[in-house]
Amino acid sequence: MKFDSAKIENVVGGGSFEIGDDDSKILDEIISEVINDIMPSEIKLKKKIEMIDNTIEYLSYELLVTFIKHGVEFGIFPIIAKYSPKIDDIPLLVKYPNKQFILDYIKTALKLEILKYEDEKIKINEDFELNIKMPKFDKIISDYVMKYNFITHVSRYALISYSHPKIAISFKKDPDIWDMILSSPYYSLCREIASDYLKIDKGDYILDVGCGSRSPKYFIDMIYPEGHYMGVDISKGLLQIAECRIKRLYCDSYELKNIDFTKIIPKEKYDYIICSHTMIYAPSLKQFLNKMMSSIHSGGKIFISEEFILDKNENICKEVFEFYNRLNKRFRGYYSEKDIVDILESLGYDFKIESLGNGILVIEKI
């Protein structure tokens, strides 16, 4: 155990004692350290996964409220309340250049039943109720919430054009900005969950799809010097940052490639594939999964983590996530476990699949 015995001595003082506020805080720290040291690794892993899931569930509520607020701010709900228009009349009533964005908003609101069709006209659904579950605030990673606050803010530029420079710049940030985002607690926790579950160790061969700038050093530290790490990313800038971090520490044992993963030549040599927040950008899910399965040997595992897997949590409002993520032209969509299983079966693979929380799937090739 790592707790400081000097702290205990300072508090108890070797006899009877009274605990003041400061002493109580010190004892709380000691108790937390002891509990953390003796807590089984499975429980620690479960708590980390719960942190991720709670963050996304809270974010779903926040995005839904923001979506409704935008309906008022953009003048969409007032127009519908006043005119009860047909869908074809919408482009004539809105004042913004990007009519498609307004139509996309209305279609999403219809799916959410915030709006409704009645006699071929669109109307406000006055029976819509917004039920929000009070989140566990001590289990929310606030930095990831801030990321979406930024995305929803730039959505107003889509009223002009989906290709507005403000939107394009937001999703093509300077690599240094993305490097800072990838170092945040949310993404750091995602890396920890992957390494804890897979029990990554020296000698392992890892393929990291969409590795970014932070994952390479994190995973190479674990497998060096006997193992091998291959990091693939479409951002040359992020790979350059990663290279600067690792080239002086490791003379070999790794490769970083600035290519689209679907264009690599698969080799059945990897023990593990890490695919974190990347699958939603795959142009073809079938091709993407086939490439990953072709890159691991029998017994190898693919660790897929996304914000959520469809149908895992009824409290997740996928429609609002999809609406705002469409601002990124590379976004393709979220998938269910069934989507993945059906594709793998159609490709003829033998596999086992395990679900961890609401956003992680682990596929083992048999």
Curated annotation (Swiss-Prot):
Signal peptide residue numbers: none
SUPFAM superfamilies the UniProt entry points to: S-adenosyl-L-methionine-dependent methyltransferases
UniProt-recorded name of the protein: Uncharacterized protein MJ0906
CDD domains in the cross-refs: AdoMet_MTases
Entries under Pfam families matching the protein: Methyltransf_31
Taxonomy, superkingdom: Archaea
InterPro entries named among the record's database cross-references: Methyltranfer_dom, SAM-dependent_MTases_sf
Lineage of producing organism: Archaea, Methanobacteriati, Methanobacteriota, Methanomada group, Methanococci
Molecular-function GO terms, alphabetical: methyltransferase activity
